[in-house]
């Protein structure tokens, strides 16, 4: 009588992280660049670099060509505003779902429920390499605990999402990531889960994972000293007002944690209306102009074209439009970030 795998239909052996990296290796130039990007992000998060960290880009990437076109535009913009804003592009390949839905490029690269994960890993890593060669720092959400072994060497900032910030598995994983990590507050707006995560991620952990050769292993981490809070609003409403920022500062100070806060301009902070992201950016820039120093970053969901679309007909998708959360378009992004840089240039030193 069978006692295990009763609900498992199929198992597929994947390429190991070591094998994928051998097929798609990192050049020495990219290696040095990523190391430099991470150091810059660490310095901003630690409030040693006065620039604002802005993580911007598509909610998720489903079209490689559109992502590369977006990246080319973003690179030109980032060079223009680099004195005041350090731009990191969103390269999100995994999407957490409240119920069901498309889980991202790695899980389902063809958008047809075929779940060609081996292809998704290859496509994702190839794109990260190409974007890195353009000279862009990259950000992603660390969702599946195995995926970082395939991708994290090309990532300069990672997020732990609102649905997973409270997860022990994700806190342990984040303690071993090689880049700074932002923890979002809970979907209900609660700050405590993110604050607790900062304490956890800074500590060493031991947990089950996989090695570069794909073997199940006990992973022992040193702890990640560069965790920080990402305020994204919640069911109770937005949480980017001066009062919310001050409450977050007080909670961090109480536990002797660095007062370093990123504000997510989308999700509940925009009331799930992408057009309201500008209002969030304006509020935050006003707070910084008034002397706030704890706000070290912003997150903006942006694409080539505005809004979003359903994937019910994958062959009929509009180019450069999100298939997950709605985004602002490129012209709005360019205008918003240039305006932000101008405002930062005039802030008190």
Specify the residue positions occupied by each region the protein language model found.
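Active-site-facing alpha/beta catalytic cores
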Residues: 2-5, 84-240, 244-245, 267-268, ...
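Conserved phosphate/anionic-ligand binding catalytic regions in large, soluble enzymes, centered on
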Residues: 53-66, 325
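Conserved, mostly hydrophobic/aromatic
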Residues: 57, 263, 329
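Glycine-rich loop at the start of a catalytic domain that most often binds anionic cofactors/ligands
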Residues: 64-76, 99-106
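Short amphipathic alpha-helices and their capping/turn segments at secondary-structure boundaries
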Residues: 68-83, 249-253, 284-293
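Internal helix-turn-beta structural module
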Residues: 303-346
């Amino acid at each position: 009588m069978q006692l295990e795998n009763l609900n498992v239909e199929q198992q597929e052996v994947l390429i190991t992280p070591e094998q994928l990296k051998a097929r798609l290796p990192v050049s020495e130039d990219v290696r040095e660049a990523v190391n430099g990007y991470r150091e810059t992000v660490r310095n901003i998060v630690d409030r040693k670099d006065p620039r604002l960290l802005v993580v911007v880009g598509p909610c998720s990437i489903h079209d490689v060509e559109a992502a590369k076109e977006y990246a080319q535009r973003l690179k030109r913009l980032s060079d223009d505003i680099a004195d005041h804003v350090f731009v990191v592009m969103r390269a999100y390949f995994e999407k957490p779902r409240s119920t069901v839905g498309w889980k991202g490029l790695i899980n389902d690269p063809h958008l047809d429920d075929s779940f060609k994960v081996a292809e998704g890993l290859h496509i994702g890593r190839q794109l990260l390499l190409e974007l890195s060669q353009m000279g862009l720092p990259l950000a992603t959400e660390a969702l599946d605990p195995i995926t970082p072994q395939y991708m994290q060497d090309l990532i300069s900032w990672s997020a732990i999402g609102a649905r997973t910030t409270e997860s022990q598995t994700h806190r342990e994983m984040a303690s071993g990531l090689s880049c700074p990590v932002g923890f979002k507050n809970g979907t209900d707006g609660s700050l405590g889960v993110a604050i607790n995560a900062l304490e956890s991620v800074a500590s060493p952990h031991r947990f089950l994972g996989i090695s570069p050769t794909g073997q199940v292993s006990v992973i022992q981490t040193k702890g990640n000293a560069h965790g920080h809070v990402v305020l994204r609003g919640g069911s109770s409403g937005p949480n980017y007002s001066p009062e919310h920022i001050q409450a977050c500062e007080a909670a961090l100070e109480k536990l002797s944690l660095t007062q370093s806060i990123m504000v997510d301009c989308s999700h509940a902070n925009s009331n799930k209306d992408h057009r309201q992201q500008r209002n969030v950016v304006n509020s935050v820039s006003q707070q910084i102009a008034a002397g706030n120093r704890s706000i070290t970053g912003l997150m903006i969901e942006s694409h080539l074209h505005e809004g979003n679309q359903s994937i019910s007909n994958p062959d009929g998708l509009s180019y450069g439009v999100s298939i997950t959360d709605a985004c602002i378009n490129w012209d709005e992004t360019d205008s918003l970030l240039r305006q932000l840089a101008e405002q930062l240039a005039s802030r008190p030193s």
